């Protein structure tokens, strides 16, 4: 309908609004008008996806649009994708940027330029927001993509067996469907920044011959979750963390417990940092001076030797304390050390994937230094040592508080990683740092949003929370938030740990929630308080009929904790409940929980 006719019809717009609309549209060209119409349509339909926002641009300028999709359990993939989109925008490209979870898979056959950033979760699994697209590409419904040029940047951790597996899957499947790779697959380890930056440059160079730039019609379209928007507004990020103050680091396991679990409270002060329940806190830490001293002594290197890290000139000791990863091994380092030490034992071990995986889980760099001495001809000096070690990376902790309850504080539940090996005690880097922190100590932090672990929008929706050990942390935050909301929905907690008397984390809080009626029920499993071990998965099966009824009544289901064993065992228990009490086949049970996941009713925060 023509704008000049608006005022003469029964329009919901006032005359002033019509005049403003006329003034705006008079200044726009046809492509810009298409973009505005798509934007307004998406605004009117808030349930729409990021691709709906960009639909008009895609139709008007399909051959000139670069689509950038990201799939990531944390914010790393989104950060890389967004930085690429900004660079493409400055070069005059029209860009559609979206999470894979918000992308309409039916749009794929219309794409001509597609750039993917995707991480691998768990044991070779796609992250939550990439699952649908990942599965779609593996089905017969996936279209031929002969007109598509693409590139994939895969994020992973070489400490795990299925390194960058999801990225490999996307690359292989797109190629099989006829798409043409702009570049070979780029695989990034945890120190991904340099490789990602190089990919940005390379892929934009590769795109250039295929696209005509039109700087005046650039469109960068993205719909972000609320948490991502809030977090991005803060000046404090992973690269620029806030220097916060430790208020409390208190042991909350008993004196006779085999585990040292700390309740840590941190003051965010005037930082303006905001978090939602379900988010994580990124913690930068310093390695132990004792550990660094042991490494330097074992290598015969001077602590005060001057080295350059980035643009900074510091002592070798300080570089090892603040800049390099010392407490987590990875395959590349073990293999490099095997060659330097010429150890036949270590060389053989590095060629056996399973043995190497177990070795990495149970050793630190100092164990290589101590047990596999370097010959003089290895000639390892300070600079070569730093080249061997990858950069220190922050650790993520599920936040155990709600800002509606604690205001400018953030609470964590931290298990001290502590292992005895050959008569030596080895500590985890971040957990030891936080456990040792005194009141008033400085800690560098930032908020890592996790849109895949969110309470239901309706506070009257029932929730089932499964969190053994420190996996209970986000559920403490959930309960604080639900109480503040005045939630009427039922809530059910499954918790487990070795001993009732020593390891019942936040026991008095849960009892108070029960007494007040905020927590409807709690089922606990203390594995070593009886002859036979009982875990949360056993309690789930025991309460299967009630749990199934809760799910039929619309309950949202949450799991937090260990991904290696617990999450898998709990999932199997849930499948058994669906089979026994829902009358489903094994295949139908899997489909049932997949449907719950796709509707955000089955969410995991596992590590």
UniProtKB/Swiss-Prot annotation:
Cofactor note: Binds 1 FAD per subunit.
GO cellular-component term (any): cytosol
Cofactor(s) annotated in UniProt: FAD; FMN
Domain FAD-binding FR-type span(s) in chain numbering: 239-456
Positions contributing to FAD binding: 327, 361, 395-398, 413-415, 428-431, 607
An annotated GO BP: cysteine biosynthetic process
Protein name per UniProt: Sulfite reductase [NADPH] flavoprotein alpha-component
Record gene name: cysJ
